[in-house]
Amino acid sequence: MKEGIHPKYEEATFTCASCSNEIKTRSTAGDLTLGICSECHPFYTGKHKLVDTAGRVERFRRKYGMQDQ
């Protein structure tokens, strides 16, 4: 392989924005923040849980005058 043309493959931490779970791995991308991970995603947990990291649900409810149930 040629020297100096490949990206650095180093330790990285992927952090979940929903549950603050940290996944240690190796990557060329560096540290990343994920919106949702396998620890809190409803498909993997089997639980229906509303994850709203950007306030979209509240904005929708205010816009259409909906109440929490």
Swiss-Prot record:
Gene Ontology process terms (BP): translation
An example Gene Ontology molecular-function term: structural constituent of ribosome
Keyword RNA-binding in record: yes
One GO CC term on file: ribonucleoprotein complex
Keyword annotations: Ribonucleoprotein, Ribosomal protein, RNA-binding, rRNA-binding
Classification via InterPro entries: Ribosomal_bL28/bL31-like_sf (IPR034704), Ribosomal_bL31 (IPR002150), Ribosomal_bL31_A (IPR027491), Ribosomal_bL31_sf (IPR042105)
Superkingdom assignment: Bacteria
UniProt cross-references to Gene3D superfamilies, sorted A to Z: Ribosomal protein L31
Quaternary structure (record): Part of the 50S ribosomal subunit.
Function: Binds the 23S rRNA.
Family: Belongs to the bacterial ribosomal protein bL31 family. Type A subfamily.
Protein name per UniProt: Large ribosomal subunit protein bL31
Organism lineage string: Bacteria, Pseudomonadati, Pseudomonadota, Alphaproteobacteria, Magnetococcales
